[in-house]
């Protein structure tokens, strides 16, 4: 007579074998379509309307950087830098910080300018 098989042990082995092979093939990840940016068609030179807008609106901005001006007026960054230098030289905007890579301006208020003059006069 053949030896008895342990049915309890076989059932555990069978469960382990089923669990290991039960996953099947994993689904292949689909490549997502990359985000497409719209091409910026910014002005290289000022036209009359944009130049007027520069002198009217930009001095009233609280934070003035070449990137902000470029984005709002739809002009190139190099043109925005040159325009901000011009506005600063005319005293329409005030320099906050100057760095080789980033220049930050703010609106020139008459109150802050007079306070600076008074403080310098006091010292």
Curated annotation (Swiss-Prot):
Keyword annotations: Ribonucleoprotein, Ribosomal protein
Basic residues composition-biased segments: 25-34
A GO CC term attached to the entry: ribonucleoprotein complex
InterPro entries with a match to the protein in the record: Ribosomal_eS25 (IPR004977)
Basic and acidic residues: bias regions: 1-13
Pfam families: Ribosomal_S25
Annotated region (Disordered), positions in chain: 1-34
Keyword Transcription: no
Residue intervals passing through the bilayer: none
Family from the record: Belongs to the eukaryotic ribosomal protein eS25 family.
Protein's recorded name: Small ribosomal subunit protein eS25
Organism the protein comes from: Branchiostoma belcheri (Amphioxus)
Lineage of origin: Eukaryota, Metazoa, Chordata, Cephalochordata, Leptocardii
């Amino acid at each position: 007579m053949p030896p008895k098989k342990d049915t309890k042990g076989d059932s555990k082995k069978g469960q382990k074998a089923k669990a290991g092979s039960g996953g099947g093939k994993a689904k292949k990840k689909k490549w997502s379509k990359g985000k497409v940016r719209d091409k910026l068609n910014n002005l290289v030179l000022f036209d009359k309307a944009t130049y007027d807008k520069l002198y009217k609106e930009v001095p009233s901005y609280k934070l003035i950087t070449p990137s902000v001006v470029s984005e709002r007026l739809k002009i190139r960054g190099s043109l925005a830098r040159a325009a901000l230098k011009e506005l600063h030289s005319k005293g329409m905007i005030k320099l906050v910080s100057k760095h080789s890579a980033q220049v930050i301006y703010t609106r020139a208020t008459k109150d802050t300018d007079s306070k600076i003059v008074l403080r310098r006069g006091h010292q």
